């Protein structure tokens, strides 16, 4: 596709370029299974007329805006919805709609470091999102990287060991509610208990929960542990464009109002501002508000259940075929052996790490899509990659432990 910028391009040529681009996107959408994006938002076309305006939610969502071209009322409605979901009263929380999960993480650690525990050490598992380590570098925080269990969950013994060694320093802790690659969920209650066992008082630690992917799944699943502000956590961030679905990248950050104590009053925008960004997208609050209003708790619960069931369905199919595979409880991320062919990986938009690949089962990924992927995978495995009896699938014992199905499986036990 020719998309270089030329002077005075005709409308006909522009339309031709965009039409070709749209056709490519529509075709590739069928194969987008490796990254957590919900593309089921055709109904958002209803909101297209808004694009004739510029909407900017600059500054604090809860303060007056100097112009009419904003969507702060919608933003506050979305924030109130999440505050209720995460069990914190309206007058006790503060938050805003971010550009994505990364900004939410940056804001959470900014609060933990700048406002509360300036000498605190940051504790994060090695399977945490890269933005956690970016925050440590940006804020020049002392980072304690914690080992992980084979399923990607934080290693609680290693955490305890490092907490005890650094007991003279406050702790700022990242909790993963769905790690980037394995979809692992850290046990918040166990981490809190570990802090208490190590002698940390409530005012000597700050917990940020990175719920980028699973934040809208766990609340609607029976027997899943609650992540709530009724527990001693400081902030929660979530991605809006992942499980919920939004055409533009966005996220939600919620914290305790008492933590946002030194807001900067900016005369130019007539607003206090404790956000990371200056100008903020005024469209994303409306898209999120619209989607939450259309779906409600019932549809979100159904989406959550369906995705978990479909993830188990894919796991079972791979397992029956003798393929190394792992799926965490309450997760929609299916980890399996990395395909040999880069073209296959590219065709199905798979995310890969070392000898592993994963599929993230989002709303819109149907069993028909899963069956199509599985059929394609088996065709490649049986007639191309491993047709030669000497060619063997990789051993994933180091990454998947007993979930590895390679020829050396007996040696793993």
Swiss-Prot record:
Gene3D superfamilies: Aspartate Aminotransferase, domain 1, Type I PLP-dependent aspartate aminotransferase-like (Major domain)
Residue ranges that the Swiss-Prot or TrEMBL entry lists as coiled coil: none
UniProt keyword Nucleotide-binding present: no
Source organism of the structure: Solanum lycopersicum
Cofactor: pyridoxal 5'-phosphate
N6-(pyridoxal phosphate)lysine, modified sites: 242
Keyword Hydrolase: no
Keywords, comma-separated and alphabetical: Decarboxylase, Lyase, Pyridoxal phosphate
PROSITE patterns for this protein: DDC_GAD_HDC_YDC (PS00392)
Catalysis performed (reactions): L-histidine + H(+) = histamine + CO2
Organism classification: Eukaryota, Viridiplantae, Streptophyta, Embryophyta, Tracheophyta
Protein name (record): Histidine decarboxylase
Residue numbers binding substrate: 129
Family stated for the protein in its record: Belongs to the group II decarboxylase family.
Biological process annotations from GO: carboxylic acid metabolic process
InterPro entries: Group_II_Decarboxylase, PyrdxlP-dep_de-COase, PyrdxlP-dep_Trfase, PyrdxlP-dep_Trfase_major, PyrdxlP-dep_Trfase_small, Pyridoxal-P_BS
Tissues where this protein is expressed: Ripe fruits; not detected in leaves and unripe fruit.
Single Gene Ontology MF annotation: histidine decarboxylase activity
């Amino acid at each position: 596709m020719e998309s270089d910028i030329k002077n005075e391009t005709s409308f006909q040529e522009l339309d031709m370029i965009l039409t070709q681009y749209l056709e490519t996107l529509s075709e590739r959408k069928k194969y987008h299974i490796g990254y957590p994006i919900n593309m089921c938002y055709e109904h958002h076309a209803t909101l297209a007329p808004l694009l004739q305006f510029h909407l900017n939610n600059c500054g604090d969502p809860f303060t007056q805006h100097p112009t009419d071209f904003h969507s702060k009322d919608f933003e506050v409605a979305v924030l109130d919805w999440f505050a209720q979901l995460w069990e914190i009263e309206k007058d006790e929380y503060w938050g805003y709609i971010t550009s994505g999960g990364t900004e939410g993480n940056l804001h959470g650690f900014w609060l933990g470091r700048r406002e509360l525990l300036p000498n605190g050490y940051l504790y994060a598992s090695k399977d945490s999102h890269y933005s956690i380590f970016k925050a440590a570098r940006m804020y020049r925080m002392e980072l304690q990287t914690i080992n992980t269990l084979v399923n990607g969950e934080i290693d609680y013994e290693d955490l305890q060991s490092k907490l005890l060694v650094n007991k003279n320093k406050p702790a700022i802790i990242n909790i993963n509610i769905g790690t980037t690659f394995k979809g692992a969920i850290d046990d918040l209650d166990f981490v809190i208990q570990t802090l208490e066992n190590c002698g940390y008082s409530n005012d000597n630690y700050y917990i940020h929960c990175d719920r980028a992917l699973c934040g809208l799944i766990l609340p609607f699943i029976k027997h899943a542990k609650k992540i709530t502000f009724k527990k001693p956590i400081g902030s929660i961030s979530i991605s809006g464009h992942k499980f919920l679905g939004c055409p533009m990248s966005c996220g939600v950050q919620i914290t305790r109002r008492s933590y946002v104590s030194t807001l900067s009053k900016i005369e130019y925008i007539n607003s206090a501002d404790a956000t990371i960004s200056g100008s903020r997208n005024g469209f994303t609050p409306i898209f999120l508000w619209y989607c939450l209003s259309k779906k409600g708790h019932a549809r979100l619960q159904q989406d959550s259940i369906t995705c978990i069931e479909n993830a188990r369905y894919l796991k079972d199919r791979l397992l029956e075929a003798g393929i190394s595979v792992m799926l965490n409880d309450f997760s929609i991320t299916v980890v399996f052996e990395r395909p040999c062919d880069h073209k296959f990986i590219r065709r199905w938009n798979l995310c890969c790490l070392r000898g592993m690949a994963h599929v993230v089962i989002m709303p819109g990924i149907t069993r028909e899509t899963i069956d199509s992927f599985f059929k394609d995978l088996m065709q490649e495995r049986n007639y191309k990659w491993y047709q030669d009896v000497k060619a063997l699938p990789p051993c994933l014992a180091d990454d998947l432990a007993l979930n590895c199905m390679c020829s050396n499986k007996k040696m793993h036990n």
